[in-house]
Amino acid sequence: MELQDEKVVRAVPSIGYVHRGLEKLVELRDFQQYVYVAERVCGICSFGHGWGYSRAVEEMMEIEVPPRAEWLRTIWHELSRIHSHLLWLGLAADAMGFESLFMEAWRLREIDLDLIEQTTGGRIIFSVCKVGGVRRDIDGAVLKEMKRVLKDLSEKFLPMLNVFMDDDTVHSRLKGVGKLTMEEALELGCIGPMARASGILTDIRAAEKDSVYGQLHFQPVIETDGDCYARARVRLREVLRSVEIIEGCIDNIPDGPIDVKVRGVPPKRECFVRVEQPRGEALYYVKGNGTKFLERFRLRTPTNANLPALVKMLQGCDLADVPNIILTIDPCISCCER
């Protein structure tokens, strides 16, 4: 950053210094083995990356995933979203010196992580998604207990949310800071909570009418102020929306198998799918060549898409506001350095 009297004059992203070459590894791994690599693009969004890659391969190979597997995938994806947003809340509170809220947010995050561990065996890397379905089922008793735990989590989260949103310190640090109008957000290609905080109705979950989200009549969370406070509100309201989605999945999940046997190898075709990660829309592109090794895998992560907007918001802001502006786009260095 270039500064002039405590004001940011110019900001330039500096990425690519710890590039890991995960996309290149698709040429060296069986297309089914690569799910494990895709999950390691990012720890916070690990399930979503494994799901996005699996969906792309399934569409390319015309594999029909059993309905129960799709509902289970949705449950785990929303648990991952709750985990991500509570992690973000703790970091944001810590950056503002709100240490009690930081500890409370991460205490609730542990409840969510315990549910993930109980149903997948892992807390960060789930390793339950596969091409053709999922590796684990969740029985009725566990689903019933999950619904009770999530109800308790939301009841504890709501008063904490109100305290955060009504606090004078939070208002002074976030309101009117890092403002991005709807027109600017559209021009800069914002996605996810960044776009929804500026009044743009964009959410892949709502766009896919034939998915589980469509059957649950999902409606995205929208704010219109476009500042750091609005972006915080979107993420925190999405925690409660994710709880509602999981409860709907538990009430409506069908019986049946959780995977199908994958036969053959990916054909000479290409395909891409979109997944709404906690930070925004991620694009997954795959290209087959008739062997068990894919010719190409390409991933566009949410942080990359939101970087131009971050540069715009930082120009002209006070140096003291830089950490909060960066935090409210919820950047993921691991996603950028894949």
For each feature predicted by the language model, list its residue ranges.
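Active-site bordering "gate/hinge" segments
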Residues: 2-338
